[in-house]
Amino acid sequence: MAYIQKINVKYHDKEAGSICELPALYTEKGVVISQIRYLAWYSSKSESWKERSIFSLKLLLTYIDVVPNFENSTLLLKGFTKALLVGTIDYDKMDDELGLYWKARKPRDANNILFHITHYSDFLALQEGFDSSRINPFRKATSYEERLNWCAYYHKHANVFLNHLSNQNDAAFNAKRVRFIDRLLEPKINNEKAMKFPDEHFEKLLYIGMVKGSTPDYKSQAMTMLLNYGGLRKSELFHLYVSDITLHPIYRDEALVRVYHPEIGRSPDSSFANRREYLLESTFYKPRNTYRLSERLYAGWKSPLLTNKDGYFEVIFNPPEKAKEFLISWVNYLKYQRVEPAKTDTHPFAFTNSTGAPETIKNFQRIHKRAVKKIGLEVQKELGTTEHGHRHAYGYRARQLGLSQVEIQKAMHHKSSLSCLVYIQPTSEDIRSKMREIK
């Protein structure tokens, strides 16, 4: 009986002389080698991107394996796309002839899966020996590799999945062609309410929720201030070094916080080329965005807009005076509560746990959730009471201050001026209030 399992493998790149750990698919016929080479080629992609790629291909292989008597691969791939969108269950008969029992997916999710399969198919079509690898007709192909090469072939020559256009001439030519499967239409949804943490409860969260007995939890307070007053993404907290937080050279009672790229940012030790080299050669750690998604030390990196050649951006506190409050919590944390790393396990990360090891996202989420509940709020993304709600609050306040879109882009470290729109759009109530003011 066929089976497809996700495993982790170590891939040795002989040309680069490096070894990396990658997710892979293991079947009854062995490992899908082409997928490993594909992920190794795109090794700089995030762990979540790699996991999603593996997940998408696993779905395709699972579907290919259960479809009986596949004579036409184009129809097979078209059926796969339909199965993603509407599911495979016949609710009239309460049965599933394929035995997959897939439920319908949202168009956005289905499109994401098709994107990853398309991207992988494009990679296969460019490999040396691609033409000879399809020596067997699709219906007689026995290995997953052969079947995937045929999928790539049909995608390349018939635009089965997505239609990528390289220039205007290609666009004009392809506009005359009938595509078998176009990108699934997604309904346009404009979130009615910004998912921002309620401003009226934030002080309570800091000074009531984040208190152990009668002792303030300075670490949690400082981290949460960086989210709400500094507009940082949650993951960016866990790339900070102690040396990244200093006194502002001009405003001496305020903190200056710089967030460096976890790999190419300038090392705190000038004898190392960058932070990646510094961590690998002087500690037992590595840049936290390079850990596997399933590892507790993993922290993502969203590629924010860096503003200095040393590979960092500066936190812009909003309101500006909150840089003073943050500095107080940060200094108190360093003086009274930070557990220093063991001498045999040193590291530069700013926030540590009770043993001195680097703090983790999961533990911070647990602390934040407990604090929110302590002040009587429900923890829901839709209510803005998760960690990400603070960044929304930051962007919303920036708009209320009258900052321009470009200024908000700079403050929130977006590469595109359009990216900040999701954080600053007015609610229906905002518009009603504005209209009432107009007389």
Predicted ranges, named:
Residues 1-45, 250-253:
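Basic/aromatic DNA-contact patch characteristic of tyrosine site-specific recombinases
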Residues 41-147, 151, 367-368:
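Non-catalytic DNA-binding core/recognition domains of DNA-processing enzymes
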Residues 53, 223-224, 231, 235-240, ...:
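Alpha-helix N-cap/helix-start motif at helix boundaries, enriched for small hydrophobics
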Residues 64-67, 340-341, 346, 356-357, ...:
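Short, basic (Lys/Arg/His-rich) helix/loop patches that form interaction surfaces
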Residues 152-216, 269-272, 295:
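Long, amphipathic, Lys/Arg-enriched alpha-helical "connector/arm" segment
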Residues 204-229, 234:
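Basic, Lys/Arg- and aromatic-enriched nucleic-acid-binding interface segment
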Residues 240-325:
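Conserved tyrosine-mediated DNA breakage-rejoining catalytic core shared by Y-recombinases
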Residues 412-437:
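Catalytic-site neighborhood detector that most strongly recognizes the C-terminal catalytic loop/helix
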